[in-house]
């Protein structure tokens, strides 16, 4: 039987992987993927805890997080495509030229 601790350990590992990805990556696409891993780690923890306490509130909140993450990804990738067409780079360092314009 898989206990609550197992789910929380998986969520913590996912959160650490996402956090390391956010801090170490220079590519904006990988930065978006890392934030998605962070949000999914929170979802795993919310669903596991709400299932453990037989409360549906955490699962509903996880659905809201999924919807917000999808809209964030759509807007972010749209902006990223426009930035790539203009600058031909998706590195974080290329964003510093935005304040010069």
From Swiss-Prot:
Keywords: Cell inner membrane, Cell membrane, Membrane, NAD, Quinone, Translocase, Transmembrane, Transmembrane helix, Transport, Ubiquinone. It is found in: Cell inner membrane. Pfam families: Oxidored_q2. The chain crosses the membrane at residues 2-22, 29-49, 63-83. GO terms for biological process: ATP synthesis coupled electron transport. It is a multi-pass membrane protein. One of its GO terms (molecular function) is NADH:ubiquinone reductase (non-electrogenic) activity. Disulfide bonds: none annotated. It catalyses: a quinone + NADH + 5 H(+)(in) = a quinol + NAD(+) + 4 H(+)(out). It comes from the Bacteria. Its main location: membrane. One of its GO terms (cellular component) is NADH dehydrogenase complex. InterPro entries: NADH_UbQ_OxRdtase_chain4L/K (IPR001133), NUOK/Mnh_C1-like (IPR039428). Its EC number is 7.1.1.-. NDH-1 shuttles electrons from NADH, via FMN and iron-sulfur (Fe-S) centers, to quinones in the respiratory chain. The immediate electron acceptor for the enzyme in this species is believed to be ubiquinone. Couples the redox reaction to proton translocation (for every two electrons transferred, four hydrogen ions are translocated across the cytoplasmic membrane), and thus conserves the redox energy in a proton gradient. Belongs to the complex I subunit 4L family. NDH-1 is composed of 14 different subunits. Subunits NuoA, H, J, K, L, M, N constitute the membrane sector of the complex. This is NADH-quinone oxidoreductase subunit K. It comes from Campylobacter hominis (strain ATCC BAA-381 / DSM 21671 / CCUG 45161 / LMG 19568 / NCTC 13146 / CH001A). The gene is nuoK.
